């Protein structure tokens, strides 16, 4: 009898962003004043009106199993939101609610990937994508994006990496970790190319509300029915309404795919916590949500400007101004090389400056560091000041 764990988990790595955040929390518990730039979550609390809707649902006894794809009211509200805001028409039967966008992506990759199928990943990329793809026997294929071009994705970039085994491309705009918002015209060209080649588009739109300046967010599925038919539109309540711990995300896609994803959901998650779904429903239906989102977006835009200004004071620092999300992704290569890489640099900054950052190699970009500016302006300035001071000793 063979013993031991399955080979599929032998190379599985824990999330580096969660690991960094855990280390920072551990130090804080010991009384150390650590400034955390690692967290991928807003520092705002979930609005009270959303919490109250959840409490109300609890008191009304909404504590039993729910339909695996999500309560009907929530799926209907998501369909209304997608039509009104994203200009894409979906039926509730084409929507599946699961335990956060991360679980939604897990189910999508489970549904579409066979051994050896390739998935294009514009790089830098969110740390979870390649791990999930490999877990299901897929091959992540990096599409390197240039800092000098603002980490924008072009059709030519995509064409260079497409092969007969290409099954899908992940589009994450606004982007984590770079903050890039992909240009609409280029996205259209890429989408049309994917239609021609029969390549799925997995559109991760979790940061759609956090777009700054002249940048414009667009859902690829809105381009045409042909594009919609090959697209998995993924979103969540985590960032938009500061509900990261609630774990509620969803996918909208053609019904034949939605049925498969719902079946997989039923055999894994069963259903998202029933009473929590009523909080998500309130987030979509309550007019106060718009004011809350605007408040967060305005705060993040101010902090982005502050982060760019403060980081630019560090000698040799090259900073691309983010157009969206709430991350900044500066090139620290000049300093990382002196210490043996960006992982060593992040360890040095945690030890010396008591600042937690995420090494760029986790995102496929060695030499860079990701800093979240989802923290108070005062702590933001103090944290970058500490980084600057520590780097002077290298």
Swiss-Prot record:
Subunit structure, interactors included: Homodimer.
Cofactors: pyridoxal 5'-phosphate
GO BP field: amino acid metabolic process; biosynthetic process
Signal peptide region: none
Recorded GO CC terms: cytoplasm
EC number: 2.6.1.1, 2.6.1.78
Protein name: Probable aspartate/prephenate aminotransferase
MF GO annotations: aspartate-prephenate aminotransferase activity; L-aspartate:2-oxoglutarate aminotransferase activity; pyridoxal phosphate binding; transaminase activity
Domain of life: Bacteria
Record organism: Aquifex aeolicus (strain VF5)
């Amino acid at each position: 009898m063979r013993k031991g764990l399955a080979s599929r988990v032998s190379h599985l790595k824990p999330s580096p962003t969660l690991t960094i955040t855990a280390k920072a929390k551990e130090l804080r518990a010991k009384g150390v004043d650590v400034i955390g730039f690692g967290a991928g979550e807003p520092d705002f609390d979930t609005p009270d009106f959303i919490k109250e809707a959840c409490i109300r649902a609890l008191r009304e006894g909404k504590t039993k199993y729910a339909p695996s794809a999500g309560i009907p009211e929530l799926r209907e509200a998501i369909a209304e939101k997608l039509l009104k805001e994203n200009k894409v028409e979906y039926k509730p039967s084409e929507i599946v609610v699961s335990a956060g966008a991360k679980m939604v992506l897990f189910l999508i990759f489970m549904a579409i990937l066979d051994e050896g199928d390739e998935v294009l990943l514009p790089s830098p990329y969110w740390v979870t994508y390649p791990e999930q793809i490999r877990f299901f026997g897929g091959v992540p294929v990096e599409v390197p994006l240039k800092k000098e071009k603002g980490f924008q994705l072009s059709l030519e970039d995509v064409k260079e990496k497409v092969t007969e085994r290409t099954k899908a491309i992940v589009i994450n705009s606004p982007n984590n970790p770079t903050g890039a918002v992909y240009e609409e015209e280029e996205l259209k060209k890429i989408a049309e190319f994917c239609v021609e080649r029969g390549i799925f588009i997995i559109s991760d739109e979790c940061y759609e509300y956090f777009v700054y300046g002249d940048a414009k967010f667009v859902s690829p599925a809105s381009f045409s029915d042909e594009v919609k038919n090959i697209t998995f539109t993924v979103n969540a309540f985590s960032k938009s309404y500061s509900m990261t711990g609630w774990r509620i995300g969803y996918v909208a896609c053609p019904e034949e795919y939605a049925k498969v994803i719902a079946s997989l959901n039923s055999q894994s998650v069963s259903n998202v916590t029933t009473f929590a779904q009523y909080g998500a429903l309130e987030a979509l239906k309550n007019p106060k949500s718009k004011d809350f989102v605007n408040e967060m977006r305005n705060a993040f835009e101010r902090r982005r400007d502050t982060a760019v200004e403060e980081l630019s004071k560090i000698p040799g620092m090259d900073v691309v101004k983010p157009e969206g999300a709430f991350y900044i992704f500066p090139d620290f290569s000049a300093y990382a090389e002196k210490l043996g890489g960006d992982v060593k640099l992040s360890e040095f900054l945690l030890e010396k400056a008591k600042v937690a950052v995420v090494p760029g190699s986790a995102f496929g970009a060695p030499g860079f560091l990701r800093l979240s500016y989802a923290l108070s302006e005062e702590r933001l300035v103090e944290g970058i000041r500490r980084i600057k001071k520590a780097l002077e000793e290298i």
